């Protein structure tokens, strides 16, 4: 038996079905138990929700393997799952991260920004005023310390994010935007804000994007 904790059970089943066509599953898909993490964990983040992941690990304590799957990112990094991982450590279970692309590091590597000192700050505020204040704070930190600041945004807010960036940041600040990473349609652009203001096109409203700024 295999148990998988997921962000969305429906898409997880579809993914496993597709994978099984070339890599047979250890157990038939019909026999696999897929449990969704609670919605409030998605919204608040595992570290703030007070969610106890131990009940999801009962089968692991009995010797069964458990997989943690998220929608479009790396589980427990900008996606739900850290509470389950933490609970596994607390219970003495072995945690094994699997090799795979992580958009944050791919975007950083392709940005031309400082890859020795960087910080991922999650999502920025949705309110325009609060977002502008946060952007200026991150820009100041980047220029003072040389630390690259990275964040992500929901695709349908990409246009608002780019508009806010161009309104809030100094012309000499470098802004990198990477969208659709690992896809044939991937776009990675890294220019000063002044160059972006000349009419460079940002990501569309349907594609996940990673944003990064630095000196």
What are these regions (language model features)?
Residues 9-10, 82, 101-102, 155-159:
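Alpha-helix N-cap/helix-start capping motif
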Residues 74, 78-141:
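Class I SAM-dependent methyltransferase SAM-binding "motif I" and its flanking Rossmann-like core
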Residues 4-96:
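Class I S-adenosyl-L-methionine
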Residues 22-24, 111-116, 137, 168, ...:
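Short, hinge-like loop/turn segments at secondary-structure boundaries
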Residues 44-57, 134-139, 187-197:
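Short, surface-exposed amphipathic charged segments that create phosphate/polyanion-binding patches used
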Residues 33, 64-65, 143-215:
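A contiguous loop/helix-start segment that scaffolds small-molecule binding in enzyme catalytic cores
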Residues 40-47, 126-129, 183-186:
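A short acidic, often aromatic-flanked loop/helix-cap motif at beta-alpha or helix-coil junctions
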């Amino acid at each position: 038996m295999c148990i998988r904790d997921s962000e969305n059970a429906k898409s997880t089943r579809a993914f496993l079905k597709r994978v099984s066509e070339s890599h047979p599953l250890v157990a038939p898909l019909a026999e696999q138990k897929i449990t969704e993490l609670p919605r409030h964990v998605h919204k608040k983040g595992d570290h703030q929700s007070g969610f106890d992941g131990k009940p999801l690990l009962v089968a692991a304590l009995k010797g069964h393997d458990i997989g943690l799957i998220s929608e479009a990112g790396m589980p427990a990094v900008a996606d739900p799952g850290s509470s389950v991982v933490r609970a596994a450590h607390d219970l003495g279970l072995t945690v094994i991260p699997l090799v795979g692309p992580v958009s944050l590091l791919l975007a950083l590597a392709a940005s031309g920004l400082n890859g020795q000192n960087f910080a991922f700050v999650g999502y920025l505020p949705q309110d325009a005023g609060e977002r502008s204040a946060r952007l200026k704070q991150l820009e100041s930190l980047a220029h003072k310390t040389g630390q690259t600041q990275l964040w992500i945004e929901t695709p349908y807010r990409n246009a608002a994010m780019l508009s806010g960036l161009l309104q809030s940041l100094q012309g000499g600040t470098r802004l990198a935007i990477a969208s659709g990473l690992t896809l044939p349609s991937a776009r990675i652009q890294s220019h000063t804000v002044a160059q972006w203001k000349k009419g460079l096109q940002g990501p569309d409203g349907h594609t996940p994007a990673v944003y990064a700024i630095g000196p």
